[in-house]
Amino acid sequence: MNVNDILKELKLNLMANKNIDESVYNDYIKTINIHKKGFSDYIVVVKSQFGLLAIKQFRQTIKNEIKNILKEPVNISFTYEQEYKKQLEKDELIKKDHSDIITKKVKKINENTFENFVIGASNEQAFIAVQTVSKNPGISYNPLFIYGESGMGKTHLLKAAKNYIESNFSDLKVSYMSGDEFARKAVDILQKTHKEIEQFKNKICQNDVLIIDDVQFLSYKEKTNEIFFTIFNNFIENDKQLFFSSDKSPELLNGFDNRLITRFNMGLSIAIQKLDNKTATAIIKKEIKNQNIKSEVTSEAINFISNYYSDDVRKIKGSVSRLNFWSQQNPEEKIITIEIVSDLFRDIPTSKLGILNVKKIKEVVSEKYGISVNAIDGKARSKSIVTARHIAMFLTKEILNHTLAQIGEEFGGRDHTTVINAERKIETMLKKDKQLKKTVDILKNKILTK
């Protein structure tokens, strides 16, 4: 029975009820509505808060009538229209938030796919190997051993393998775990009975594919290695696929039984190299798109990030997240320039910036003006040398944020007032001389991206 039929019959019954005054019925009951919520919950909605109070003495009568009509136990509550609408809006928000959470979770899960992996010279062979084995698990290259430094994309590839196999081979059971997780489980089970240890091994061996990320965490754990060795052999003997990743090649792994090292090399061992600049740049562009950054990020700004974060994909993603946060806080800025980025990443340690130091600034400026670095530090007062010296001081303050005293010391032991005058002079000239401004911008970009 739908709510319209219930409501129609309810009103007829209440109108015929001699205990309900006709004016009460016409003013407050005639306009009520009923809404169903869930399997057996009904809400009686009165027009106004005053109307809700007016029918208070008849609520039990209304409840009984509804139960008699439905002939089943139900839960009945009362409210008024304004409150009901507020609750609907609140429920809708909760539903939307829940939907957003689910969407984000799905998106997070789907991030680790072959389609989302940025391929470049540094990782192409590893990508091809993992994808090939995932398409034919247990057929060739068993085990597949991927190695390389942290942050190069090994975890992404292994999770992509898991997602691909689960999507395309529904009959295959896949187990993915980190080496640390496997070690902790093994240590726990080793405290228990022989029967429970065997059950642990059998449970893992029930899978068709085993993926262990960062297998190096199993090193120097003799008893754990014995369990691992048994599982390893079971998978190989039954043509079930093994994937491993490590920060070192099998030959360089310490703390493993030689039998395991030999078995790691049975299939295919392949390296993921350090990211080349081209691949790092492609990852940055993809991450900017993934994070839906509204501002345009200039190529110079992207090059800056790729130069200083190309050793770690996680750091690249973190740096783009920083851009995203800045963009959200500064929506009026439509373009993220290299000046903005260099200021945003001013906290990068000098060691990380490598050759980005005063020496590099002097070299770039002196090359532009056709003079030696010694001339910039020296006492010569020719116009071109003085201009180059002042620009180099200005850029040192602008890029490295050194103190006036530091800059004076770095430029031939000059007084800090000399540095102030140099900076002010360049700042004044930049406002008037468009060609000089263009030159300084080119020099700055070259220093930051070289």
Curated annotation (Swiss-Prot):
Gene Ontology terms, cellular component aspect? cytoplasm; plasma membrane
Q: What keywords is this UniProt entry annotated with?
A: ATP-binding, Cytoplasm, DNA replication, DNA-binding, Lipid-binding, Nucleotide-binding
> Sorted alphabetically, which CDD domains does this protein's record hold?
AAA, Bac_DnaA_C
* Main subcellular localisation: cytoplasm
Q: Which residue ranges does the record annotate as region Domain III, AAA+ region?
A: 108-327
Name the Pfam families on file: Bac_DnaA, Bac_DnaA_C
Localization per record: Cytoplasm
Where do the segments described as Domain I, interacts with DnaA modulators lie? 1-76
InterPro entries the record matches:
AAA+_ATPase (IPR003593), Chromosome_initiator_DnaA (IPR001957), Chromosome_initiator_DnaA-like (IPR020591), Chromosome_initiator_DnaA_CS (IPR018312), DnaA_C (IPR013159), DnaA_dom (IPR013317), P-loop_NTPase (IPR027417), Trp_repressor/repl_initiator (IPR010921)
Q: Name one GO biological process term.
A: regulation of DNA replication
Outline the segment boundaries, as ranges, of region: Domain II: 76-107
| Keyword Cytoplasm included in the entry's annotation | yes
Q: Classify the source by domain of life.
A: Bacteria
* Binding-site list for ATP: 151, 153-155
Q: Name one GO molecular function term.
A: ATP binding
Region entry Domain IV, binds dsDNA, spans: 328-450
Q: What PANTHER family does the record point to?
A: CHROMOSOMAL REPLICATION INITIATOR PROTEIN DNAA
Q: What is known of its domains?
A: Domain I is involved in oligomerization and binding regulators, domain II is flexibile and of varying length in different bacteria, domain III forms the AAA+ region, while domain IV binds dsDNA.
Alphabetical list of NCBIfam families matching this protein: DnaA
Q: What does this protein do?
A: Plays an essential role in the initiation and regulation of chromosomal replication. ATP-DnaA binds to the origin of replication (oriC) to initiate formation of the DNA replication initiation complex once per cell cycle. Binds the DnaA box (a 9 base pair repeat at the origin) and separates the double-stranded (ds)DNA. Forms a right-handed helical filament on oriC DNA; dsDNA binds to the exterior of the filament while single-stranded (ss)DNA is stabiized in the filament's interior.
Subunit description: Oligomerizes as a right-handed, spiral filament on DNA at oriC.
Instruction: Say which family it is in.
Output: Belongs to the DnaA family.
Q: What is this protein called?
A: Chromosomal replication initiator protein DnaA
Q: What organism does this protein naturally occur in? A: Mycoplasma mycoides subsp. mycoides SC (strain CCUG 32753 / NCTC 10114 / PG1)
